[in-house]
Amino acid sequence: MRRIGRTLRDRAVQRRLGAAVLSGVLLALAFPAFDFGLLALVALVPLIWAWRDASAWRAALYGFVFGVVFAGILLYWLWYFGLVAIVPLVAGWGAYTALTGYLVGCLNRAGLRSPWLIAAAWVVPEALRARWPFGGLPWGDLGVALHDFPPARALASWGGVALVSFVIVVVNAYLVDLGVAFAMQTRRAMVVATAGIVVVVAVVAVADGARYQTRPSGQLRLATLQGNDQDRYLTTEEKRSGYLAERHFALAERLHGPYDVIVFPESSLDEFSPESNPGLRSRLVAVGRAHGADVLANAAVPAPDGREFNQNLLYTPEGRLAGTYSKEHLVPFGEYVPFRSAVDWTGIVDRIPYDYTPGTQRTIFRVKGHRLATVICFESAFGPLVRDFVARGAEVVVVSTNNRSYRRSANSEQHIAQTQMRAAETGRPFVQASISGISAVIDTDGHVRDTTKLFHQAVVSDTVTTTTGETPYVRFGEWVVVASALLLLGAAAASRVRRPPATFPKLPAADREPVGSGRIT
């Protein structure tokens, strides 16, 4: 403990901790609701400066502080679920950025300070966080900050969000090298850093200009119903009377003309299932028959294990159940409670009295000769899942979601940003259907159109052009993550053979790490 206190009292360490906090704040400002996306290109400069010359353990400390600050701001809407949700998720986020810091510290010790290696050390833990624990949490991946920047979306079509994250880190790292070289008046280092930035800009320009164009395969006319206008939890009486279902059926009466698909989003039928309620099923089919449309509805449907699926169901105008898709990636502390028995003393167990069962089959629906995939709620944040649907032949993707629990927070805007990147990665049109907003149509390049406001009843009616063909990301998958892992392994092997000479000057003496083992425990 004395060593920890001595370390934290050191002025150089304090400056670096302050830099980590600053980076966390700046990066949070790059995401919705602030959405200063291009700020991400400089937001990591303080953090990477803090990592420069740092030991592995101290770099891990700086990474942890950065991650906690960033995630604490980005995921502030988790407060709706209490401390039992936000504390472990934010701390877990910090653990992954601590791992990035540790890897960078190991590279420092080996004399390897390349921006490309720092980017690899970022991408690999980011990919791990998207997969483990509890199925992963890709929300807030670095590359998503540039969701409204067309060249970044073009990059995503080549290598997914991971490639965008990689490029952002490289740019930030070269800016640090350039700044230090300028401060130390080291001409060679300035030339190398400037050349690196020029190379990155050139690569992005080429990727943007040579973007793979998916092929139009037809058109589908869709309508999504956004019926919830209550910015609060519904009363017991409202739930019993089917408040949400009635609001959505009332919106359906406003539809005119033929449609191919009409979407009743996640939770729009309250707690009723059309498979166990013939009257409800008849009403859904009647809506479809009136417009010659298939109806995509969502309901809680009994599962074989006695629990329930969160399930999308597709009904034809003739009344046939054409197929179902059960949500695969359930929301921790939202649709199930990890370690339920250990946290049964908290209020969250009262709000989530039972756990859903995850689905196991990825269904491609057939609609008017086209192949349509659906994902439910935050599943649109999982690039590999959506990629697999497209690889199986999906020509359009519908995101059925219920974000009402997050009220008027930035969650819904962040959700749209995730879906933009999925559209850009796959070259498919997306329709985001939400019971309370934000609903939207997103083009194959990730451009958003026809958006709605939160908690306003609305109908999004549009014709989308379905597409076929595989972008490089769909064809080759997470090749950036694999390449980053191999790059780190190669660096580890090279460091055992010889210690390469430092390319860039060290920081001024006042900013260097204090002499010692560098351990904080």
Where does each model-flagged region fall?
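Membrane-embedded alpha-helical bundles of multi-pass enzymes
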Residues: 2-212, 407-408, 419-422, 434-442, ...
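Soluble catalytic domains of enzymes that build or remodel membrane lipids, polysaccharides, and related
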Residues: 210-480
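Short Lys/Arg-rich cationic patches that frequently serve as NLS/NoLS or arginine-rich RNA/DNA-binding motifs
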Residues: 277, 505-508
